[in-house]
Regions:
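Membrane-interface micro-motifs in multi-pass membrane enzymes
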Residues: 105-146
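Short juxtamembrane and helix-loop transition motifs at transmembrane-helix boundaries
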Residues: 34-42, 60-67, 91-92, 139-146
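Short hydrophobic/aromatic helix or loop-helix immediately within or flanking a transmembrane segment
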Residues: 48-80
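Transmembrane signal-anchor helices characteristic of membrane glycosylation enzymes that use polyprenol
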Residues: 7-31
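Extracytoplasmic catalytic/substrate-binding loops of multi-pass membrane glycan-assembly enzymes
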Residues: 22-40, 49-60
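Membrane-interface alpha helices of multi-pass inner-membrane proteins
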Residues: 155-169
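Transmembrane-helix motifs of polytopic, lipid-linked glycan transferases
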Residues: 77-99, 137
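Membrane-interface helix-boundary motifs at transmembrane edges
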Residues: 2-4, 88-98, 146-154
């Protein structure tokens, strides 16, 4: 029975990934995205992001993503699916399949103002969704280590410290 449950969960995650990847394909480049696509990014890189918003990691992801379409679409899908996946791991749901669908449904009914600032354009997405995913991983690690007193594998601990550092950039 456990194999069937895992299989259903895997299929749901693949469907969520495909949905968000397709959304990424349909989403056109907007104002900031087009700026990063132009020579603006080389000017900003020359001065080390000095006049920018301080979201260095998101801006670097944005620069790469606007120049490599397939990577932009795939990262849009993976980060979006990763947020749902991390929420499920934080909550430690027993009925995984139904909760994945519930979390996905709730993500789809975001208020339009929040959607416009995050999922509605790639600059906002890489600045906010990426940091949300990193924050969720940090919360997941802390809950497991502090509340449940679970010993984390070395690789997860290293990832925790790396993401904690880069999450501030």
């Amino acid at each position: 029975m456990k194999t069937i449950q895992l299989h259903k969960t895997t299929l749901i995650l693949i469907a969520i990934l495909l949905f968000y990847t397709f959304m990424g394909i349909l989403l056109p480049l907007m104002h900031d995205d087009l700026q990063w696509f132009s020579n603006y990014n080389t000017d900003i890189l020359k001065v080390g992001f000095a006049s920018l918003n301080g979201r260095y990691i998101g801006n670097i992801f944005e620069i790469i993503a606007v120049h490599v379409s397939w990577l932009r679409w795939l990262s849009y899908g993976l980060i979006s699916m990763g947020i749902i996946w991390m929420i499920m791991h934080i909550t430690r749901c027993k009925a995984w399949t139904s909760y994945y669908l519930l979390a996905f449904s709730l993500m789809l009914i975001l208020p339009s103002a929040i959607y416009a600032d995050t999922y509605g354009w790639f600059a906002g997405f890489y600045n906010y969704a990426t940091s949300t995913l990193i924050s969720l991983f940090i919360i997941y690690y802390c809950i497991n280590a502090i509340i449940y007193k679970e010993k984390q594998p070395v690789s997860v601990t290293v990832l925790f410290y790396v993401l904690s550092f880069f999450g501030q950039l």
